[in-house]
Amino acid sequence: MAKKWVYLFSEGNAQMRELLGGKGANLAEMTNLGLPVPQGFTITTEACTQYYEDGRTINDEIMGQIMEYIGKMEEITGKKFGDKENPLLVSVRSGARASMPGMMDTILNLGLNEEVVEVLSEKSGNPRWAWDCYRRFIQMYSDVVMEVGKKYFEELIDQMKAKKGVTQDVELTADDLKELAGQFKAEYKEKIGSDFPTDPKEQLMGAIKAVFRSWDNPRANVYRRDNDIPYSWGTAVNVQMMAFGNMGDDCGTGVAFTRDPATGEKGLFGEFLTNAQGEDVVAGVRTPMHISEMEEKFPEAFAQFKEVCKILESHYRDMQDMEFTVEHGKLYMLQT
């Protein structure tokens, strides 16, 4: 029997931290509790160790299992990876047993290319959203996978805002974002010497390798040395279906604690941004609103979120630190 390198969220649980990493084990646990988690799979910490043993390559057996599990995700979601008409878009995140600085940041909206964006923008009737997703993906992939500094892209965004006479990213139109995506790809080609990858499988493998590589980067190594974390642990990789907080004003994203982190007093503490994606809340691109204001904007999602918090606190018997997205008024839990 071949070794199992990949687990669906529905196949894991909170006890499997060593194999699935903290994030993966908790996503599995939330899935088992019946909470609204966008589905996906975790590539194990053992696959990371194997990647280094194989001279920093992903061997055929692991590669085969990853693609097999993409197939399972396609069945669950009814979407197809790399399909123009109904594309499966995913996020890729690292997840070690213990949370660590220096580990790879998230990549969102993976699976997009120019053709897919054109169809998405037409089908969704929301071209601004489609191009926003694409320019964010190019930006993150370039930064995280290829190590092209964020600043080059931020400068291009600032120039575009100046040209259009606006101050906020959200004020840029679909055409502005489309133009930015083109500028980003030109920047990528200039820095890397090849075209930005259009094949979703190539994008996915690039992102997974970047997570494995980040286990061995200088920041991670220093942190491990200082905190007695063995090198042999490796990191897991979580591949998850996207939930979109940036599709309009009935969408958003947030982070919250079930208690005040300073005093431990019970009550929701956190921040929320409408029409935004994950990193916007922490990146300080816009000023977020207090989590309590979410109740006015999204009463149903907020009521459900409060219920989820109750379930998680009583289940884990501990304060929870959560990330979530609201897509067209529907709540999705991304992490606890």
Stretch-by-stretch model annotation:
Residues 1-336:
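Nucleotide/phosphate-binding sheet-loop regions of phosphoryl- and nucleotidyl-transfer enzymes
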